[in-house]
C-alpha cells in the first residue's frame, strides 16, 4: 500500500478501525470491525450508510455551450435536463462504445458538474480535454476543470433523515435525481 494516496477522511477511517485497501491508488476502507460485509450491506439497504468517494474525479464545465459540448460525449439530452437535476449517463467513444459512466448534475443553464470513476481519472481527463480542444477550436469560451476534493455518498431509505439532522437542513424537497451543494458549510443550490 506504499505510495497510495489518502483521502481527507483517512484519519477517521483509521480511528474507526477500517480495514484499508488500495483502490484506485487511494487507501479506502472495505469494512469496519462493527459489521460484517453482509451486515453492512443489509444496513444500507434497510437504513443508511455513508461512503468516502473522495477518490472520484469531479468535473466542472461552465459556459454557454456547456450542454452542447457534453452532449457530444454522452447519450443524454443535457439541454432538456432541468437545472437542479442529476442523471446517470455514460461517456461514449467515436463508435458508440462505453468509455465510462458518470453522474451529471446540471447546476444551471451554463454550468454542469459531473463525477467520474476514480480508477479511470487519467483516461477520462485526457478524453475530455482532447474532445474539448477539438470542440472549442478557440471559439466557444468554455471553462473546464477537474479536481478531487472531499466527497461522500449517502445511501439508503433513511439517509435523508440522518443528513437533514446533521446539516440542520430540510431535505424533504430534495428528491431522487435532485441535488444541492455545500461550500464551507453553507448550502448552495
Task: List the predicted regions and their residue ranges.
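Glycine/proline-enriched, intrinsically flexible loops and inter-domain linkers
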Residues: 1-189
Amino acid at each position: 500500500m506504499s505510495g497510495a494516496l489518502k483521502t481527507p477522511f483517512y484519519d477517521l477511517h483509521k480511528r474507526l478501525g477500517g480495514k484499508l485497501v488500495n483502490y484506485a491508488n487511494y487507501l479506502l476502507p472495505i469494512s469496519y470491525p462493527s459489521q460484517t460485509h453482509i451486515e453492512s450491506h443489509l444496513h444500507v439497504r434497510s437504513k443508511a450508510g455513508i461512503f468516502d468517494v473522495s477518490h472520484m474525479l469531479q468535473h466542472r464545465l461552465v459556459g454557454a455551450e456547456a450542454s452542447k459540448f457534453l452532449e457530444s460525449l454522452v447519450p443524454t439530452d443535457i439541454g432538456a435536463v432541468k437545472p437542479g437535476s442529476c442523471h446517470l449517463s455514460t461517456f461514449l467513444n467515436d463508435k458508440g462504445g462505453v468509455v465510462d459512466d458518470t453522474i451529471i448534475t446540471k447546476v444551471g443553464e451554463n454550468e454542469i458538474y459531473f463525477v467520474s470513476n476514480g480508477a479511470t481519472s487519467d483516461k477520462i481527463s485526457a478524453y475530455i480535454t482532447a474532445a474539448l480542444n477539438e470542440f472549442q477550436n478557440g471559439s466557444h469560451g468554455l471553462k473546464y476543470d477537474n479536481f478531487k476534493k472531499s466527497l461522500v455518498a449517502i445511501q439508503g431509505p433513511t439517509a435523508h433523515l440522518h443528513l437533514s439532522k446533521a446539516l440542520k437542513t430540510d431535505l424533504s424537497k430534495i428528491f431522487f435525481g435532485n441535488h444541492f451543494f455545500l461550500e464551507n458549510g453553507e448550502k448552495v443550490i
